[in-house]
């Protein structure tokens, strides 16, 4: 229904918004649900526990750390949506994080581990070992572990050491019987569990069974060999998460690469934001000391009933997956893209028609070939590309280096400020420069998050430009795991736009003219605000307003308010938001025409797609940008239209299939809570599985 003027609602009311941090925790809870879901293969459930832990580590290192910094600085202003102060946010985060970690450990200990045991995969403690296994593990400790360990004594001359971020440590309380005075008899030693050693040590076992013991269990059992002459009183396991957000002062920075390299060294030693302690064998005296030394409070301390740092379960997954194929997802192989058919030459096909790529259902290899073939083609004069996150052994990097070595003009923007990929990107920037590429580090005070490649070719005396645009990174590894779109075109206007875009990045150009591209921080928000306004106008005139928007996160208040206006005008809005969503749907007179769903499953939903009905003249945009304030204001992003009618129909069908998912979809209610979509006896639709089946069918039909 559309509101009358006398019925105006205050769209700034905090009751209409979810807090960003709490909404993110709700997303990670959906990841944890995948570990609890018994329809998922057992080892995949193990992997989801690992992903949950890894996500939470980063959340504490960045988001919680930032809130703590605000509190320390005396900043107590409420955030602009849900109206929570930093202190209130920290309190609510602590309650929810404790609850989620308790559920995580309960899932691991009470469900996943027993199920693994039924398959012959069993965790043993030192006390469970047979005589043969004890002999094996003692020899293993003496030869493989002991030489790597550094026992650190704590006393007046050797203060409590600075312990690495995310490191697992053993606090060993020792008793010295030789001391006369009782107060001098208790000593403390710290042993850091080396991250370079295998966390899971597999033991001699009968038959097809795989029994293992954890590295920290082994070290704990032999601490007397590290502190000879003392009696081991207790061994307490603990792990510290530190503030790891980089502070980069770009003003006056002559060499951004050196500034970032310097800051990276500090990341290991930031203030403690979380302390995890193993419940088993915990010593209250050690715990009291850790509180004091690390300056943590009760809400920062997580006493867990199980092994600390469950990110390690990913390495266990990788070890066991090849041996237990029935416990992992059935293999699904990315198919040849339907827009390429049997064509060998991507460039000649792009001259015929635009090419749409849908990963991981369709192979990422044509994107690699696009750069590799350009490097090998003697007619290619220049290659320009933005890189945000790439794989550890990137074929695209290798192709760019070859192109430069062959004398082509190669310009690469390597975003040095890509969080937790800074070190990797510094390495690639140096390597590309050494190969002869012109490397630029981005735009001051902005992260270049756009995904674009331009190839310039001279053939038969004519200059041709080919452009690849994407919603995801140029990363051949994650392209097998993330859902994303790629688009290759030889349209002249797109080529001109790409040239202008790269000139903006590399020079002193102010906002250039674009035919089709919208670029943040210039005008992406304005573009989408205008498109929503148009949809409102069309709905008032024709009654058929309809918007579908798919993204990773939705936090931008101006865009949220604009969608509330669309809902109030009667426009139907369907949002597919995998992660954080600050918008609340279903609120009478505010958002009753908005539906919000989140799909969390085998593949990480990563594509950004924006659909507007436009009174039948449908408009579809793909983008590198989510509807987040940082994407609108603090990043260089690209949004681009799909012009081909068949391509638009294909993307719309994919959106509709995703909205019909009733297996991996959770829907948000007006209170901000998420619930599984009820199947109600209809056909089960897992959109990701169905998209893979469609890709296979397209290949078979060719």
Curated annotation (Swiss-Prot):
Q: Which GO terms describe its molecular function?
A: ATP binding; metal ion binding; polyphosphate kinase activity
Assigned EC number: 2.7.4.1
* Cofactor annotation: Mg(2+)
- Superkingdom of the source? Bacteria
Name any Gene Ontology BP term: polyphosphate biosynthetic process
Q: GO CC annotation: what is one?
A: polyphosphate kinase complex
Q: Which UniProt keywords apply?
A: ATP-binding, Kinase, Magnesium, Metal-binding, Nucleotide-binding, Phosphoprotein, Transferase
Q: Which residues form the active site?
A: 449 (phosphohistidine intermediate)
**Pfam families xref list:** PP_kinase, PP_kinase_C, PP_kinase_C_1, PP_kinase_N
Which residues of this UniProt protein bind Mg(2+)?
389, 419
Record has Secreted as a keyword: no
Q: Which residues bind ATP?
A: 55, 482, 578, 606
Q: Which family does it belong to?
A: Belongs to the polyphosphate kinase 1 (PPK1) family.
Q: Under what name is this protein listed?
A: Polyphosphate kinase
Its source organism is Bacillus anthracis
| Gene transcribed to yield this protein | ppk
